[in-house]
Amino acid sequence: NLSKESVTVKEVAELCKKNNPNVKLEATKDEVPNLGYTLSNKKLLKTGFKFLYNLDFSIKEMIQNWISNENIENLEFIRAGEKEFIDERGKISNYELPESINLVGYIESKKNTIRANHFHPVQEQKVLSVKGQFISIYKDLLNTNSNKITHVANEGDLIITKPNVAHAMVFTKDSIILNLVRGEREHKNYGITHTMKHVLVNEDEKKLLINSYKFECRCCGNNKLKRIISLGYQPLANNLLNNKNQNCEMYPLEMNYCSNCHNCQLSVIVDPKKMFSNYMYVSSTTKTSREHFIGAAKKYIKEFKLKPKKSYIIDVGSNDGIALKPFKDLNFKKILGIEPAKNLAKLANKNKIKTFNGFLEKESLKKIKKNANIILASNVFAHSDKLKEMAQCIFGLLHKNGVIIIEIQYLLNTLKDLTFDNIYHEHYNYWSLTSLINFFNQFDATIFKAEKINTHGGSLRIFIKKGKKNKIEKSVKILLKEEEDFGIKNFKTYQDFAKKIYKIRKNVKKNISNLEKKNGKIIGYGSPAKATTALNFFNVSDEISCIIEDNKLKHGKFVPGVKIPIVSKNKLKNKKNTILVLAWNFFEEIKINNKNISNKFINIKDLEQ
């Protein structure tokens, strides 16, 4: 739709530069194939047809459209074969290509090797995986805020990568791939080679990916997992830095969905010893958490007729003993915590709450007294890669008439309320009641009761007994129907969630920038794991001068990735501070308790619109 008869490449380039000063122009010495391309048609003009836009306006409009849209979708995507025909001879799969090809490259790759580490300025890359498996890593080079994203290509997958997307392949099995090419290997007319080197994955990252990637569902074993969302490469959320220049390992933070059992899990497994050997999250820090477990203890004592001298209570992942302390205060004698973090187990034992320091696994089972009447596990089933082993151990410790009470951050709340910042590497799994029932069905056990609770921005509490003959309360059926109606079994529900989260990132970046321009430097409040996830995903660093934290163990540390210092609120002298509350689930408590340091508190959730 151009009003000019002919135009040269140089003219188009200069108009692009005019409308977007960030464009870099590079002249080449290549032979120009012709002096200009005819873009209009005289015969067409004679019919009375008129061009609406001139070239300058058209380019400006395109650039504005590109700027307003975050190019997240379809930078690289995987397509399975369609219209399959299967008989006794085998299988035929068909792949419809968006464009014709004129060259096929046959490539063999050994396990534990890297290929690609490049991008194509002009062409799409299309690779068909014939045999084996590889992890594909890609990044949009046209968007400076883009994340590095990974996904898995299995046999029979067609992987399509867009131009100007850097990509690499880490082979986890001996593999054969076909490279399907349109065009020549070089574009001499434009002075640009077909393939430009761009090292996206080095040897260290290759080893990290190979050692940590999770290819199958840990609940049912399905290896065809679907990507929900990528929050980019992120540091371990609670591994705070001792100084600003300290390096930290970065791992993909990506959630996958299993269409077989509806489990959601991360794409990688980080060695738990790296996260839990010296754990910074102390549950008793907030009054809200303490009151929650006091109320829970009183509820369980009444509901299950627990006796102070007889009833035996175990808490798995007991932290500093927060869930057992109310029982101790009510004179319960037989209580035991199981906690892998040395510092927290030591703290609990110091406070006279008997705590076993270690992971709950087969090796440690023989060291722990059995026949518990109640076994508590608060946010523990999110923290284990060895779910089946842990579940077997819990059932092994339980009295035949005992009850397991599990609290988990509720996936339905995460999806509804867009609380993506509850996603971090400690949380291997993200549970719905639907997926929990599918999981515990494997152990001849019954979830007989379920209830929503308010912790962590929305959680679920379930009650489990051994055997299949237990009466199931209405609460289970009601919540299952709510999940079904919401679309917990429909992958589109998860795709819609991801789209909304990418939009939130754009809004928060804009609103924090406006807030800083209006009020100067911003001070954060609270450095929970969710703050690490959010700040790194938003790429917010210099905009926040420091973060106040009530947990003394964190003072003098830095948030990994964004490297924002964590300080005591005693450091603040000016009541005119703008406080951005990152621990948004404790917003009201923080606001009420800190009127002396500021009269302006903003919940980070309010910046998402």
Q: What are the language-model segments listed below?
A:
Residues 71-103, 116:
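A short, N-terminal "cap"/entry segment at the start of jelly-roll beta-barrel domains
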Residues 210-288, 451:
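N-terminal juxtadomain amphipathic helix
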